[in-house]
């Protein structure tokens, strides 16, 4: 599971997800990628499940790039605990994703294999996504028109 080695502060506020992604909104490394169409939190378990789904489908052929990292701790209080007595302890880590963000990329395999692998990975993620190619997502602004 992905998580930071060290953090300056153990707990964070929830924050809000406004607007579109301004960075990471084009396919930079591979030939095809998964682009988020709505905002959301993606846990480290979901990232790992999507990575495994892609890796199993492309076998040893291509390469997978994970372009998001879960750096936000989500806290949880124990069950049947009374209100108050402070914020709960960190339970898991999430990556904050905005619309237009390319989360995974695949390269080194042919188009059918890459698209099927990414389709399997999309089913592991909690937000709406679409598969984009390097040509479609060349300019971040143009690719985000449908977002």
Curated annotation (Swiss-Prot):
Residues passing through the membrane, by range: none
Keywords associated with the record: Ribonucleoprotein, Ribosomal protein, RNA-binding, rRNA-binding, tRNA-binding
Q: Which GO terms describe its molecular function?
A: rRNA binding; structural constituent of ribosome; tRNA binding
* Matches recorded under Pfam families: Ribosomal_L16
* One term under GO cellular component: cytosolic large ribosomal subunit
| Gene3D superfamilies linked to this entry | Ribosomal protein L10e/L16
| CDD domains, sorted | Ribosomal_L16_L10e
Q: Which GO terms describe its biological process?
A: translation
Q: Which NCBIfam families match?
A: rplP_bact (TIGR01164)
Database matches in PANTHER family: 50S/60S RIBOSOMAL PROTEIN L16, LARGE RIBOSOMAL SUBUNIT PROTEIN UL16M
Q: Summarize the protein's role.
A: Binds 23S rRNA and is also seen to make contacts with the A and possibly P site tRNAs.
- Cite the record's note on assembly: Part of the 50S ribosomal subunit.
Q: Which family does it belong to?
A: Belongs to the universal ribosomal protein uL16 family.
What this protein is called in its record is Large ribosomal subunit protein uL16
Query: Organism source for this protein?
Result: Caldicellulosiruptor bescii (strain ATCC BAA-1888 / DSM 6725 / KCTC 15123 / Z-1320)
Lineage from the top down? Bacteria, Bacillati, Bacillota, Bacillota incertae sedis, Caldicellulosiruptorales
What gene makes this protein?
rplP
């Amino acid at each position: 599971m992905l998580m930071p080695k060290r953090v300056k502060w153990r707990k964070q506020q929830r924050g809000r997800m406004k607007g579109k992604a301004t960075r990471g909104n084009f396919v930079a490394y591979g030939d095809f990628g998964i682009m988020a169409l709505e905002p959301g939190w993606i846990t480290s378990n979901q990232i790992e499940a999507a990575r495994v789904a892609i890796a199993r489908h492309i076998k040893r052929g291509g390469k997978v790039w994970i372009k998001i990292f879960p750096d936000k701790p989500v806290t949880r209080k124990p069950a049947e605990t009374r209100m108050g007595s402070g914020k709960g302890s960190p339970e898991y880590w999430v990556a904050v994703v905005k619309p237009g963000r390319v989360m995974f990329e695949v390269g080194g395999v042919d188009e059918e294999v890459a698209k099927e692998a990414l389709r399997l990975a999309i089913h592991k993620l909690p937000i709406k996504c679409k598969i984009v190619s390097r040509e479609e997502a060349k300019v971040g602004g143009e690719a985000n028109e449908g977002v």
